[in-house]
UniProtKB/Swiss-Prot annotation:
Pathway: tRNA modification; tRNA-queuosine biosynthesis. Catalyzes the base-exchange of a guanine (G) residue with the queuine precursor 7-aminomethyl-7-deazaguanine (PreQ1) at position 34 (anticodon wobble position) in tRNAs with GU(N) anticodons (tRNA-Asp, -Asn, -His and -Tyr). Catalysis occurs through a double-displacement mechanism. The nucleophile active site attacks the C1' of nucleotide 34 to detach the guanine base from the RNA, forming a covalent enzyme-RNA intermediate. The proton acceptor active site deprotonates the incoming PreQ1, allowing a nucleophilic attack on the C1' of the ribose to form the product. InterPro entries: ArchSynthase1/Queuine_TRR, TGT, TGT-like_sf, tRNA_ribo_trans-like. It comes from Treponema denticola (strain ATCC 35405 / DSM 14222 / CIP 103919 / JCM 8153 / KCTC 15104). This is Queuine tRNA-ribosyltransferase. Residues 254-260 are annotated as: RNA binding. Zn(2+) binds at C311, C313, C316, H342. The active site is at D96, D273. The gene is tgt. It catalyses: 7-aminomethyl-7-carbaguanine + guanosine(34) in tRNA = 7-aminomethyl-7-carbaguanosine(34) in tRNA + guanine. It comes from the Bacteria. Keywords: Glycosyltransferase, Metal-binding, Queuosine biosynthesis, Transferase, tRNA processing, Zinc. Homodimer. Within each dimer, one monomer is responsible for RNA recognition and catalysis, while the other monomer binds to the replacement base PreQ1. The lineage of its organism: Bacteria, Pseudomonadati, Spirochaetota, Spirochaetia, Spirochaetales.
Amino acid sequence: MKEKKEIFTLLHQDAASPARTGVLELPHGKVLTPAFMPVGTAATVKAMTKDDLDEIGFEIILANTYHLFLRPGIEVIKAAGGLHGFSDWKKNFLTDSGGFQVFSLSQLRKITEEGVKFQSHIDGSRQFLSPEIAVELQTGFNSDIQMQLDICSSFGISKTQTLADLKITMNWLDRAFAAWHNTPHEYDGALFPIVQGGFFEDLRLQSLEAILKHEPRGIAIGGLSIGEPKDLYQEYLSFTAKHIPKNKPLYVMGIGTPDYILEAVKNGVDIFDCVLPSRNARNGNLFTHEGAISIKRKEYEFDFNPIDSQCKCKVCRQYTRAYLRHLFRTKEILYSMLATYHNLAFLYSMVQDIREAIQNDSFNDYYKNFLKKYENRLD
């Protein structure tokens, strides 16, 4: 059995909202919260070196179990000493269970209580993923935080189908914790369960009740930002978050735009991840304090200003919008490197500012002032 322990320390609670600062104590170092985690699908954040991530200041990144399980495979990563030895990223890794990719990428998948059978999107080979295998893989990766295998119910499905999904997820929850408790003694990564239940309050509470019996070190909220209207995201984020014990670090999966991050922090969320900041950067969409801009637009052809005059990242200190537009249009590799660096540095700096506002009991003012400028732009 793994020891019961708390990995989260509350540093400050905002005076007028659930927003809070804290610190996560993980095997590969501390993580100040709130914290955004860049997504490194194949143990690398696309177009970024580990030194880039370190230079910006990130203390934790995410890697995808599904992709790493299929290629290069668990044996290669274990032989390298886990993800840290394989990638030379010395700080923390959070890994997902692989379930979301199985359901979104794979063809001919079949879900049963035992697990999910699926075909690889790479070569069509038949594969099987269960709660126990997900824990075994992530333990082999030496993940600092690993996630429970779950079913993320699609937006818009019936309550009957959502309940059927939830029953399987709760079965997998029990099996995941049984497997985690049997991992080697020297492995000290945390297992985070995931609150599901779709857009039904009673099912969300049923999911959380099952989770709390396991006294987890942290809890994730899943099944949000999956295509629902923004007001529904806000409603169910707020509803779910307020029922989670305050001594647990709270992770909301799949959010990474400034407006969604602010809404999460406003509800007491501590960590969040999303592929969009880096993917959008590669596709020409860049964050600024005045809203996102599309660098491919002709209006930037003679614009010799930085991406964002308020941003202190090295890209904004050295390069202009006109130059970045040129790199994008000529499909230069350097474009993806510079654009990704900027978007991730922008979010990191924003979250630093959020932490400072919380410490000063002025989060609500920061929230309103940021969104007033950010949402006022249509590009």
